[in-house]
Amino acid sequence: MKRRVFLKHTLVGALTSLAAGPVVGLGAGVETPPPINLQRLFDTSDPEVAKLAEAIFRQCVLGKLSAPRGALKRTWITAGGGFVGQWIWDTMFVVDLLSLLPDMEQNIRDVFQNYWDFQVRWNQQRPAYAHDMVSCMIEPQNETKWLEYPAYSQIPILAWGVERVYRRNGDKELVRQCLGPLERFHEWYWRERDVTNNGLVAVGAYSGDIQHGRFETFDYECNLDGLKLTVHPTRKGEKEGAWYGDICAAGNTAYLIMGERSLVYLAEATGDKSLAARRQRRIDKAVDAMRQHMWDEEAGTFLSVNRDSLKQVPVATIGSWIALMAGVPTTAMARRMAEALRTESWQTPLPVPTVDRKDKRWKSDAYWRGDVWPAPNYQIATGLVRYGYQDLAADIADKTVANAMKNGVSEHYDAVTGKALGVNFLGMSCTIATMMLDGLTNKYRLKLREIPK
């Protein structure tokens, strides 16, 4: 019997008391699964690991499912706290774990369809060059001003999210639903964020607000302190505006490469060889561009660059390390990245800080300017394992889990004290459990229960 069939038949029952409190997000209109006994979901010999995992699944995963309302006409996933809406990157970490649970297929399809419904609405009222953007977030209360705000996107990992769900639950209907809109979203990204056609993507915002442009990536990352928005370098027209960032971000470029790799995988899974070939061409060009222009041997990582001059921005930030997960570095580059991550620049008591500790702007509790976030830690650890650095990955993952056990599950943390910062049980902090389930940890072991053979 396969694991999912086993789960469907054995995890029905009263919700465990260890993950106290109601599942706050569920409401009328959500396709409610059978009650899940979270105690029976996990296989671990450590009761503290079980308690942590149960709390994460209740509060960060199941607790973020929300009923249709306002601008969101289908089941959606809220981020948590005061972040009321369906974001791009937050949501992908949640659906990844949601797909492990039985009878969640339709809810997950609805979550993705919210993005594609937005694409249709957006395209009806925007010029052709702006078509197929997916906004950073869709807010249920924003039914009248959504065309003006948010007029920017976010880290492009929707395709990665679909791949993760498909690998976990085999939902080909979801893949068929998403392939077309995903490719169009990626083409928007290349068209409107790689405006010099060099294979590197910048940030931007149709609002013309510089901070909105920064919101497309790690909100206050130090590499974007000098960001300016300009008009399109080649397209002319009386309605053109200063919407295009002049810094190509190492993080967002790597994320788009990662998304393209996921799209190749999904296309091949459905037999669409031409789609896979189109995406592979994008990957090859972008990987070459990152290696040629963004790699810095001294820093031991990838740096953002000026869009027009390709001069590197001299600071390494959290986005510098996403290239590992995206498969960008050569073997030699990855070795140098592992060396750099072992230095005091990045080995804070709780790693990995969001900017080089030697940078004068670093502050251990500053938002994307020295603090620590579970989701990037998960992605860095995943990338390290990809290149064979399991011990370093486990060190990062184990310290992240241990800190959550001590200080609670939270949005982000102080890199020195480990103090919890921001929103408790933010949805994407579910990646603390993902680290264990993906086998990235050494000390803290967690698996889903398997049927005895």
Q: What is the predicted role of each segment?
A:
Residues 5-28:
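N-terminal export signals
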Residues 88-122, 319-329, 377-390:
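Alpha-helical support elements that line or immediately flank enzyme active sites
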Residues 45-56, 103-117, 171-190, 270-291, ...:
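Extended, well-ordered alpha-helical scaffold segments
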Residues 159, 166, 257, 263-264, ...:
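Heptad-repeat amphipathic alpha-helical coiled-coil interaction surface used
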Residues 1, 22-44:
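C-terminal segment of N-terminal export signals and the immediately downstream linker at the start
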Residues 36-86, 110-148, 198-248, 288-372, ...:
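Extended glycan-interaction surfaces of carbohydrate-active proteins
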